[in-house]
């Protein structure tokens, strides 16, 4: 009669046949057999992320195959290995192939860390941007699935992975989740995360300091490169030239490339045809604005992470009023929580609604009014905002004006650009993104923007 260990080995072989190789190698092989008692099969996952993923995506398959193999119903419990570290010497039943694989992985990681200076590949990843905090909806299902596939098996199916979509829809979140995932699986992985602006600045510094070889080594030695906002490479001929060769070097070496943009490659103006071709050779995954159910799920998940309980009607109220993007939605949530905390009022629709929509309805304003009020609050003139001046006060006022026109009017990006002396629509888009990024970290700017909104009675949800 086969032992439990032999039966588990048989289960593993059947799982290997039923699952794709990347899925088996990434999720099943690292899991260790811990115990089998009273019809319960206990497995140990290497970390909490793997444990959650196994439980959510593979527990049913494991239960079905194990039940068939053991000859009776089997329930699977998946635990985190670290939780059992104190008694693993007494209870844990390991297999030599798994143990050897763990040792080999550890040794390889040590070799990698010795060969490559750590500081070269320390990605500035946001700790919040991980897969288990990303809410998947119809708007993002394909992009999420592609990101997971790339994270599990980099350099194979979708290379490059090109994620595109509007501002604040989760492109950066998905991209950085891939980086976190790879580092979770392989701490020695060389992950490079940069914005296109950083890549360009690094290139300029390298040219000035005669450091092109070091620059090329830094980017071309990466196992995984994540480049955010690649649309800003438009019109930068030398940057495009260098990125073309970097792309080729990485792709030919089988390294994974992930790019994000606010539009598909073919719609990026002044982008070299050869780059359009290369950016399109993998998979282009689009993210759309989330629907009502997804927006509600996003708010619910955020509330859970903040350890707060929000009434369902309040969640539905906020989700129904902030429809453009996730960043705007989460901003409304933060304001509602802060308002309730400061005032001591309960978190209800009645108490929060006036703060989120003080006028009761979105007020349409004219571009001229925006210019007037921004000039008044920021201490510049309307003429200066329409001029090419790059003085910081003027530049900041101009960006805020573009941001508020987008939120308070129905003007398209090109029409907003016309209101500021014929600025290009990409300049307007960049200005909007910059203001949105700064609002959470620069209280003075946030106060000035709110003051203009109050003067104009702009409903913050008035954005098409």
Curated annotation (Swiss-Prot):
Cited Gene3D superfamilies: 1.10.1750.10, 1.10.8.60, 3.30.300.180, P-loop containing nucleotide triphosphate hydrolases (3.40.50.300)
Gene Ontology CC terms, in alphabetical order: cytoplasm; plasma membrane
GO annotation terms (biological process): DNA replication initiation; regulation of DNA replication
Region described as Domain II: spans on this chain: 84-123
The entry's keywords: ATP-binding, Cytoplasm, DNA replication, DNA-binding, Lipid-binding, Nucleotide-binding
Stretches the record annotates as Domain I, interacts with DnaA modulators: 1-84
SMART domains per record: AAA, Bac_DnaA_C
Positions with a binding annotation for ATP: 168, 170-172
CDD domains: AAA, Bac_DnaA_C
Span list, region Domain III, AAA+ region: 124-340
Chain segments carrying region Domain IV, binds dsDNA: 341-464
Cell compartments where the protein resides: Cytoplasm
Summary of the function given for this chain in its UniProt record: Plays an essential role in the initiation and regulation of chromosomal replication. ATP-DnaA binds to the origin of replication (oriC) to initiate formation of the DNA replication initiation complex once per cell cycle. Binds the DnaA box (a 9 base pair repeat at the origin) and separates the double-stranded (ds)DNA. Forms a right-handed helical filament on oriC DNA; dsDNA binds to the exterior of the filament while single-stranded (ss)DNA is stabiized in the filament's interior.
Similarity comment text for this entry: Belongs to the DnaA family.
Assembly and binders: Oligomerizes as a right-handed, spiral filament on DNA at oriC.
Domain notes: Domain I is involved in oligomerization and binding regulators, domain II is flexibile and of varying length in different bacteria, domain III forms the AAA+ region, while domain IV binds dsDNA.
Protein's name according to its UniProt entry: Chromosomal replication initiator protein DnaA
């Amino acid at each position: 009669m086969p032992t439990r260990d032999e039966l588990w080995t048989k289960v593993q072989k059947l799982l290997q046949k039923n699952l794709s190789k990347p899925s088996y190698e990434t999720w099943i092989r690292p899991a260790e057999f811990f115990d089998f008692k009273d019809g319960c099969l206990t497995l140990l996952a290497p970390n909490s992320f793997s444990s959650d993923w196994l439980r959510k995506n593979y527990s049913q398959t494991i239960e079905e195959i194990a039940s068939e193999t053991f000859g009776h119903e089997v329930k699977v419990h998946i635990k985190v290995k670290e939780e059992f570290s104190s008694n693993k010497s007494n209870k844990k039943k390991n297999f030599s192939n798994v143990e050897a694989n763990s040792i080999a992985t550890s040794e390889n990681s040590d070799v990698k860390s010795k060969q490559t200076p750590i500081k070269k590949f320390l990605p500035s990843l946001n700790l919040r941007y991980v897969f288990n905090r990303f809410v998947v909806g119809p708007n993002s299902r394909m992009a999420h699935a592609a990101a997971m596939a790339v994270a599990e098996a980099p350099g194979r199916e979708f290379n490059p992975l090109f994620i595109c979509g509007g501002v604040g829809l989760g492109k950066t979140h998905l991209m950085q989740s891939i980086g976190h995932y790879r580092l979770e699986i392989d701490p020695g992985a060389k992950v490079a995360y940069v914005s296109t602006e950083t890549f360009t600045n690094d290139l300029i510094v390298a040219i000035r300091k005669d450091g092109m070889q070091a620059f090329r080594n830094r980017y071309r030695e990466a196992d995984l490169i994540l480049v955010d906002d690649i649309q800003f490479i438009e019109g930068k001929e030398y940057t495009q030239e260098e990125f073309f060769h970097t792309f080729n070097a990485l792709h030919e070496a089988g390294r994974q490339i992930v790019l994000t943009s606010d539009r598909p490659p073919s719609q990026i103006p002044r982008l070299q045809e050869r780059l359009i071709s290369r950016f399109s050779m993998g998979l282009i995954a689009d993210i759309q604005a989330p629907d009502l159910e997804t927006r509600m799920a996003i708010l619910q998940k955020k509330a859970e992470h903040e350890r707060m309980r929000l009434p369902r009607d309040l969640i539905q109220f906020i989700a129904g009023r902030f429809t453009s993007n996730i960043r705007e939605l989460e901003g409304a949530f933060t304001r509602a929580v802060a308002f309730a905390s400061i005032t001591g009022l309960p978190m209800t629709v009645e108490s929060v609604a006036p703060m989120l929509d003080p006028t009761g309805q979105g007020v349409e304003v004219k571009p001229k009014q925006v210019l007037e009020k921004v000039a008044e609050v920021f201490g510049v003139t309307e003429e200066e905002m329409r001029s090419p001046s790059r003085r910081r006060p003027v530049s900041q006022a101009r960006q805020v004006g573009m941001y508020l026109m987008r939120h308070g009017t129905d003007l398209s990006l090109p029409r907003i650009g016309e209101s500021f002396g014929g600025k290009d629509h990409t300049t307007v888009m960049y200005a909007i993104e910059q203001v949105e990024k700064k609002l959470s970290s620069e209280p003075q700017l946030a106060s000035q923007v709110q003051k203009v909104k109050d003067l104009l009675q702009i409903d913050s949800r008035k954005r098409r």
